[in-house]
Amino acid sequence: MASKPFFRRRKVCPFSGDNAPKIDYKDTRLLQRYISERGKIVPSRITAVSAKKQRELARAIKRARFLALLPYAVK
């Protein structure tokens, strides 16, 4: 008996859609969901963010770090 191969469901980008949140460097609560506990930016294959939005997200996180809204590293 051959079983059907299992396909993992493709996650949808959380920043696409009508009521999706805007990526803003001042919104630290949103940005912290995409930073690991060590302070590193989480890759898009884990967070399911599209490539364009991942670049925007990384830019916003780096900008927030520069303005001391987010830490560069957590000890």
Swiss-Prot record:
Binds as a heterodimer with protein bS6 to the central domain of the 16S rRNA, where it helps stabilize the platform of the 30S subunit. Keywords: Ribonucleoprotein, Ribosomal protein, RNA-binding, rRNA-binding. This is Small ribosomal subunit protein bS18. Coiled coil: none annotated. Signal peptide: none annotated. Belongs to the bacterial ribosomal protein bS18 family. The gene is rpsR. InterPro entries: Ribosomal_bS18, Ribosomal_bS18_CS, Ribosomal_bS18_sf. It comes from Roseobacter denitrificans (strain ATCC 33942 / OCh 114). It comes from the Bacteria. The keyword Membrane does not apply. The keyword rRNA-binding applies. GO terms for biological process: translation. GO terms for molecular function: small ribosomal subunit rRNA binding; structural constituent of ribosome. It holds the Pfam family Ribosomal_S18. GO terms for cellular component: cytosolic small ribosomal subunit. Part of the 30S ribosomal subunit. Forms a tight heterodimer with protein bS6.
